[in-house]
């Protein structure tokens, strides 16, 4: 295919970008002034007000970590997308930066959609993102019209940028509207870009482009097509090399699949983010060697984006509310990101994701409970009021007989709680929200391998924030992210055993300090 990659960027300014950014800042500030903090995160990244979704433009640049994110500054529901921005010198203490992008060009007049950041050969950063327009000019009933855009920062602090314009147009006869979320990297002496596409046949694909100068791009081929015909779009694609413990290189392809049907424990969310591990050689398509696996098994995880800081592959995900009711929308804000996770390729041949080491810097006021034993249907309160904590716990599976055992978090006087438990009957870790007083309910499970079950030991690392929980199983072999809307009053944490006994080898509770964005 040719004819849709211009020799130079194309742009048509229709609004003053500076004025639009000023309006957006005022929109966020209006929500922030009235925000209810009952579920607003203490140590997760969120906007000061308004709606957020996908993490964007993740990078480590000139000594600072930068996290951008999709932002609707004028509502707590999804709307015209902007780019919000926070930065940090240590991944522990964060500061708010000016909003980076607002719609101001004809090519993006209905939204500055998701994209990524990459450092070029000259050491300078470039942003690639999707410009979004409604095909009928006013709403989503006629589908999308999307193109890929380039922007360059005006300073090393990344507090403003100059939009260069469209670098890849959309061949509308080959695409069923969805055409977005560019990811750029370099292999050898050539730059590559991939993004998600819904083909004319409504198949979820990732297309591959190449460039010598990061401006003029050439279509190469379909990098990957999802084998499931129900999957019509692969959002927020990711693609990166990773080495195992022996130094052997594999390639990871990640995407958020739209259209997959639920089956058993798999694909229970509206859309599901996952990956495959395989091989790739420039000039060829990606060759998967594994099945599709979820990045995260919780209720509320989507649109992850990873980046390499020179030593580690780090990923942030968006905690997506997915389905109503969404009570935080009444509080002047909606949505937050997960903790940053380091991706490694384990000896078991699978990806592990665990919080980056810097997260230990959030701990304060630690209590070590040592070993704990509970009798049949036993219960022990380990915190009377835990607003923001991390719990490290190791369960002795061989010495426990409980059918389910674990932690009731956000346990309030009205009887509401969220349950993080090991379920012995199904051999899985569970986040169960059946007792939640607000928000969506249901439960999600993370699998344990036969090897893990046979080990007789289960390690859980549980991060509880004001309105969400993240669970890391056995040093990150599985991860789970779910919203948990606590009721009014003290929020206790209780260790419980159901229909049997529980033996905990160790339990440590850390109260967590703020990351500075409240």
Task: Go through the PLM ranges and name each one.
Residues 3-5, 25-31, 246, 279-518:
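Beta-rich accessory regions
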């Amino acid at each position: 295919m040719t004819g849709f990659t211009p020799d130079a960027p194309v742009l048509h300014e229709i609004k003053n970008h500076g004025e639009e950014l000023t309006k957006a800042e005022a929109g966020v500030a209006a929500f922030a002034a009235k925000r209810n903090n009952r579920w607003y995160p203490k140590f997760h990244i969120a906007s000061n007000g308004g709606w957020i979704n996908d993490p964007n433009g993740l990078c480590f640049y000139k000594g600072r970590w930068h996290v951008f994110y999709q932002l609707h500054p004028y509502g707590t529901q999804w709307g015209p997308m902007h780019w919000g921005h926070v930065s940090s010198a240590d991944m522990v203490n964060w500061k708010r930066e000016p909003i980076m992008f607002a719609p101001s060009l004809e090519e993006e007049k209905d939204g500055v959609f998701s994209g990524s950041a990459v450092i070029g050969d000259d050491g300078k950063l470039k942003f690639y993102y999707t410009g979004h327009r409604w095909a009928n000019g006013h709403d989503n009933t006629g589908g999308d019209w999307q193109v890929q855009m380039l922007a360059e920062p005006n300073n090393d602090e990344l507090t403003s940028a100059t939009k260069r314009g469209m670098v890849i147009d959309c061949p509308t006869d080959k695409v069923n509207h969805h055409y977005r979320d560019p990811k750029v990297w370099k292999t050898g002496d050539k730059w590559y870009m991939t993004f998600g596409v819904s083909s004319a046949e409504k198949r979820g694909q990732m297309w591959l482009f190449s460039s010598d100068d990061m401006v003029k791009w050439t279509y190469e081929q379909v990098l990957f097509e999802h084998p499931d015909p129900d999957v019509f779009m692969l959002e927020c694609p990711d693609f990166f090399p990773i080495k195992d413990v022996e130094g052997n290189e594999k390639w990871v392809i990640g995407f958020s699949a739209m259209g997959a049907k639920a089956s058993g424990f798999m694909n229970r969310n509206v859309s599901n983010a996952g990956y495959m591990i395989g091989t790739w050689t420039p000039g060829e398509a990606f060759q998967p060697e594994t099945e599709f696996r979820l990045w995260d098994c919780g209720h509320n995880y989507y649109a992850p984006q990873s980046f390499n800081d020179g030593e580690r592959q780090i990923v942030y995900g968006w905690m997506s509310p997915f389905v109503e009711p969404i009570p935080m929308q009444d509080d002047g804000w909606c949505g937050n990101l997960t903790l940053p996770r380091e991706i490694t390729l384990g000896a078991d041949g699978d990806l592990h994701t665990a919080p980056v080491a810097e997260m230990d810097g959030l701990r304060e006021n630690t209590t070590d409970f040592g070993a704990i034993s509970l009798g049949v249907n036993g219960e022990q309160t380990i915190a009377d009021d835990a607003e923001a904590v991390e719990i490290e716990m190791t369960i002795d599976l061989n010495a426990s007989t409980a059918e389910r055992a674990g932690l009731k978090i956000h346990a309030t006087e009205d009887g509401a709680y969220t349950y993080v438990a090991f379920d012995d009957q199904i051999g899985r870790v569970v986040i169960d929200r059946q007792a939640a007083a607000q928000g969506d309910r249901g439960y999600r499970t993370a699998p344990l391998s036969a090897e893990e079950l046979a080990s007789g030991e289960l390690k859980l690392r549980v991060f509880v924030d004001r309105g969400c929980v993240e669970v890391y199983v056995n040093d990150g072999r599985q991860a789970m992210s779910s919203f948990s809307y606590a009721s009014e009053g003290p929020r206790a944490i209780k260790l419980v055993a159901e229909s049997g006994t529980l033996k905990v080898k160790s339990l440590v509770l850390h109260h967590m300090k703020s990351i500075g964005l409240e």
